[in-house]
Amino acid sequence: MAEKTKAFELRTKNKTQLLEHLKELRTELSSLRVAQVKSPNPSKLAKIGTVRKAIARVLTVFNQTQKNHLRAVYSKKSSSKIPTDLRYKKTRAIRRRLTNKQSKVVTLRVSKTATNFPQRVFAVKA
């Protein structure tokens, strides 16, 4: 079971299959740890690393698929209703920045001045 599992192969599996595979890998890891204590065989030690990485790979695929499904569920809702871990990341400064609509808002006085005194266009004599 310790052969290297590929992430693209794991993505084809459904949730129950992934959890079964994870359970198998964890039991194998525990048996390898017991074998490590009983007899320090170098081949078993190397196998522990591959099994641990396989477990990490399965968990990564599982969490990514789960997050994608949740994003699809929340896609129709407004941004304030989406859980924070599903929102876009960007940077803190960008998230706090004014939106385009907010930055284009002009006071009444400025808008009246702009309409009453438009910018002049000059023709250049050649």
UniProtKB/Swiss-Prot annotation:
GO terms for cellular component: cytosolic large ribosomal subunit. It comes from the Eukaryota. GO terms for biological process: maturation of LSU-rRNA from tricistronic rRNA transcript (SSU-rRNA, 5.8S rRNA, LSU-rRNA); translation. It comes from Dictyostelium discoideum (Social amoeba). One of its GO terms (molecular function) is mRNA binding. NCBIfam families: L29 (TIGR00012). This is Large ribosomal subunit protein uL29. Belongs to the universal ribosomal protein uL29 family. Gene3D superfamilies: 1.10.287.310, 6.10.250.3450. Keywords: Ribonucleoprotein, Ribosomal protein.
